């Protein structure tokens, strides 16, 4: 209290007591006691002199003015009183005004001199102080009453042995006290006061209570009676609070043992039973299991030996019935950095308050922000912990607001005051205390609280190293408990007798006290071990039984539909991303810059004479297509790799809301797919423009977009499976390099390791690579559907097939037939084996051959399988193969002639064939899909002749309806007996893989596998 206000208050006290007969000795003694309480000893005389001067205490009785003069003085004093009160009114808080009014009433009541003039001045004070009439009457009756029967107010509570003479509206509790302890609640300011009407010796926070004197009953206060009984602040205010009385809530936790994955015991023998309206702290040294205990009680961890029940419902078995009952605020920052204070709270509210309209949600959000003192910061981005635009205390309050917006019945908080200033810490705990007074049950882990904060808790749970509980009860009583347990001299004193402060550090100094060696130096050995403390705890503390409610707990959660959840998640994430300017800039420029760099490097004067750039002769086009796919994979992976890791902490909190995991994933995928669509389009637009790839923009974009979407889902999988962004980014090269190796470009599929390779077809291991499907689709589509080639593709296919059969297959079959003629009677087993292979090859090729002119009429099965081959048949086959070769030469020539005629027709109609070919056709790509660079045009593999040349012109040869496998670069694929374009078939495959990995993401298969592997590793170490 400032000097100016204290002088004004002194004048006010003097004016009141000078009325109607002047100052009595009792009144003056009351003022002296007040000054001694508020001032240093040296200043008491100065203020007492001021009081005596104004009150006229030193005047003789004969010097008093007559009655008429007294009345005039009274009027003057009333005006002066009004002026003083207005002056005080501008400085004191409402709580301080209530205390001043009580002191004034105590002063008047000290001599029972209730005159009209004094009463009028006191009424003036209460009016100027804006104290409601009901509360003034309550305070006046409380301060002046000698009989409890006159205190007929609902804000009065009587503690005594027998409820005799109780007024109808009063509350009553039983207490072993002679006389009556009278408690008063001033609801408007949330303050409690106590008077003792009796002759016994009771102590309040260690001070002897003078009978009839009014005392502030503040947070953490304890009244002790002569018989050793105690009345705690937390228990008494619960009797005042109607919300606590009407809330049906019970929380019972019985945790016999909890082990971590590595087998270490984290929690032992914990039993907690609580009802509504409690603020309960959990303290302990580092590694004592505070956060573990909190997580078990919140349901984040499951104890193998123990249960946690809310209103009789198991938190793990009855999740649906307990939906929305629990709230959790972790020690970590759970804010979305890119959103504003308002947006963080608004989108959270939309996810849990679906029953409210948009206007109602907006109103509630603004109200919560105002209550937390954040309304002036609502439009600021919260930023990161390091790059922050709001203070640490404001961040903590906003984190708590995420749960307060829906007001769960039970709230768990992990060190909500860590890293905060003492003022911010008090604000946070004040907020939680107010919430507990509304009937909520709150548990929080706290570290090194101040005295004021420590006394705000209703109960304190103390944990010791190894997960042992060693105390469970009133916070202030904990100090005396541990002092008595260690036989300290001042064991009866729990707080400072002068200021009332408590020192929580004292508790840990006692708990962790070390044994001193013979040199007076502390050793590492503790005087009392955790087990010994726990044994004392078990013998002295029993969880007070509470009524186990059977009703479904009060629900404050209203979840929107899954579709609406998806929309809210998407809106929130989209807003966060567009608000992050560096993120947006990098992701928007990444693709066009890479395309520009890549296309610029590989564009050169490719004309045969080196004079200009011609697309047809650019040998880098196949490599560009491969790099386009790798870039699409890279962008898709990098943009999604941190998405779930970044949200991991937020997801942990939102797990209590039972929101749809699928809705969350769909929101992520929607935004990532949109971003991938933009990135791949800008890449293709820039790359195709520079390299003059014409007519392929949308076809290439669809492939790259599909590839990038696949990478998005893969990135989300690894983001879900691992907890470290570093791990994820280390994995990206491990994912991309196999995609390059097995793309079919760097290494020939026919020349891979024999364990992997399947000659003539793409290996199964390569079929797992998206790059293989994407690259094949792009190259085949570019060759088959470019503006130049698409008119001739059908003819060239027939031409290529005829050329292969006449030039390569006929010759190979002829050689096989000659070999059989030369070895009609095999000399040894090795020759016999070669003979059988040749027969097998001839049989397989001839049984499906459409050209049969000159083919022996004998049954092919009889000839080649059942040893029916003779010299006569061999000679007939020799003549047949000659005819076979000539037949396909004719087909080849006919199709070549058709192509020439078609070209001639186009040229005759004004088309520049050469220009068209230069613009749309690429020689290197053509050589790639035709495989003209290979020396082997046909090869034998496992009794089959495999065509190596011209895979683009081959037709699929499925062995069964589901047989999709075919040579690389084939133009068409088999799908359930139907022939489908390779481009669309490969698109379908990539989207199928994407869907498969989405299911893996939804069910978290990879995360579970990583978890199993981690557990297996831990078991090996053990």
Indicate residue ranges for each PLM-predicted region.
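Small-residue-enriched hydrophobic alpha-helices in membranes
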Residues: 1-187
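ABC ATPase C-loop
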Residues: 403-404
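ABC ATPase NBD Q-loop/coupling interface
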Residues: 307-321
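Alpha-helical transmembrane segments and their short interhelical loops
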Residues: 438-445, 450-454, 459, 663, ...
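Catalytic Walker B motif of ABC-type/P-loop ATPase nucleotide-binding domains
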Residues: 411-415
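Q-loop/switch helix immediately C-terminal to the Walker
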Residues: 337-354, 364
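Helix-to-loop junction immediately C-terminal to a conserved catalytic motif
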Residues: 298
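Topological signature of polytopic alpha-helical transporters
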Residues: 163-200, 204-205, 217-219, 226, ...
